[in-house]
Amino acid sequence: QAVRSGRLDNKQVTRVVEESKKLKELPLYIDDSSLLSPMELRARARRMNRQLPNGLSLIVVDYLQLMQVPGSLENRVNQISEISRSLKSLARELNIPILALSQLSRAVEQRNNKEPMMSDLRDSGAIEQDADVILFIYRDEVYNKEDPNNKNIAKIIIGKQRNGPIGDVTLTFLKEYAKFVDYIPEDKVPEEGFYSKFDS
């Protein structure tokens, strides 16, 4: 919030500059091309995998429904199925994980229990079939702001894990940093502006 408003003290400005330098040195590459097709993603990933000394370690797609299948006149469900299968194939080819964010259907907003479930994945059951792990983030305080017990609490719902158990994990969400950390009792959550304890 302070960064967006420009209300930073000298110490915070110094910190932002230092962290910006660290980010610049990270092997992080962002391609913000719109309406990327599975074939285009595969071609770019292969090229970068060859160019980098140690190859790619992870691909993040934000988000899956923004990808397109050119020339396809089929319905959106079939398109998403093709995109999902393509990402699965690319992950196997490059032997790296692909993290694909996905939209949820509007059904979540129309029921009393807002916790997302597998059937809420938008457009296709192929996502559920192809993914090795499916995680949902749920913050009850978004819907029940008056309940003090929900403050700063986030739940990671493990909807699917091909080689492990499913269930819930409770975390603390530090809003001012948009950061999830191990669960901290409410009376131990740091005041806004405190950051050193939670440095990565």
Please tell me what each predicted stretch does.
Residues 101-103:
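Conserved H-loop
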